[in-house]
Regions:
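Active-site anion-handling motifs in enzyme catalytic cores
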Residues: 1-301
Length: 301
């Protein structure tokens, strides 16, 4: 049997963590079968809104063949727009698909009904959600539904990870919705429950999307109490290196697994990025999740 796992729809490297983890999970679970990496919708991956550009794009996903196609992530709200053509084709050809580590939150009743009707007409073999809201929204439309977790919480079980040491112990700071806070110790050892966080207004009072371009002008902490502060940058790009490397010990890579090894080698994570916290927990390190981002389901087992 051929299983093809979507692994291209990254809006940031955090998407690569749960998709690569899912690939590793299926390879370990089904060693007797052929588990391959596959493409997702080019529109989702590159957020294409221009009709001409979308027409020019070669959507290889439409030509992939497998017994089972695996789609994942926050794709349920756009499943009709981005996935329907491929799903209709694969079902017509006698193939199947599953939705694993999938999410569809913040939807209106009419949107849930429309998507639910599509899932009823073109049913997946399995729907395993990564949050309870999605499960509650669609469990009545897909008979084989499971209130699951995000596979980012499984990275240390599904992917072989190495560790390394810097010249000093370190913790991770990763922020993308606001300026990085200032960290201070209440006294004693550098532990996550012993770190105070002081938030800052954006530069010149500008919205963060603009003020981040002036972030390199700010003073940044190099360390705290003998622990280095490592900044993991999840938005992969080569255009804005003044953002990527605005602070000491900034880490960015096109290798998603290396981020996981940075997390495994750290002592803890403080972040407003849910996946940054997820992989820290997956590697048995504490994490402090700040601010109002939708919380993924997770396991403490």
């Amino acid at each position: 049997m051929k299983i093809r796992v979507e692994n291209s729809t990254w809006n940031n490297v955090g998407d690569g963590w749960y998709q690569t983890s899912l690939y590793g999970l299926l390879r370990k679970t089904f060693p007797q079968h052929q588990v391959l990496l596959g493409e997702g919708p080019v529109r989702r991956a590159f957020r294409i809104s221009n009709g001409k550009q979308l027409k020019n794009a070669l959507n290889v996903m439409d030509y992939e063949r497998a017994d089972i196609h695996v789609f994942s992530g926050p794709m349920i709200p756009s499943i009709i727009r981005d996935y329907s053509q491929a799903i209709k084709r694969l079902i017509a050809d006698g193939e199947n698909y599953v939705l694993l580590s999938a999410s569809g939150t913040g939807l209106s009743a009419s949107e849930i009904a429309e998507i639910g009707e599509f899932l009823t007409k073109y049913p997946p073999l399995l729907l395993s959600t990564r949050d309870e809201e999605t499960y509650d929204n669609f469990k009545s439309y897909v008979s084989n539904s499971y209130n699951g977790i995000c596979t980012a919480f499984l990275v240390d079980r599904t992917i072989e990870l190495d560790t390394f040491q810097l010249e000093k112990p370190f913790f991770i700071s990763s922020f993308y919705m606001e300026m990085e806070p200032t960290f201070s110790l209440r006294g004693g050892e550098v532990r996550i429950d012993n770190v105070d966080v002081e938030h800052h207004k954006t530069m010149f009072g500008l919205p963060f999307r603009y003020s981040r371009h002036q972030n390199f002008l700010r003073k940044h902490q190099y360390q705290l109490g003998g622990h280095l502060i490592v900044r993991t940058v999840q938005n992969l790009n080569t255009r804005f290196n003044h953002i990527n490397f605005a602070a000491p010990n900034s880490f960015i890579s096109f290798n998603p697994v290396r981020y996981l090894e940075v997390a495994k080698s750290s002592e803890f994570t403080i972040s407003d990025r849910v996946h940054a916290c997820a992989i820290s927990l997956a590697c048995n390190h504490p994490a402090r999740f700040l601010f109002n981002t939708h919380v993924l389901a997770y396991s403490t087992d």
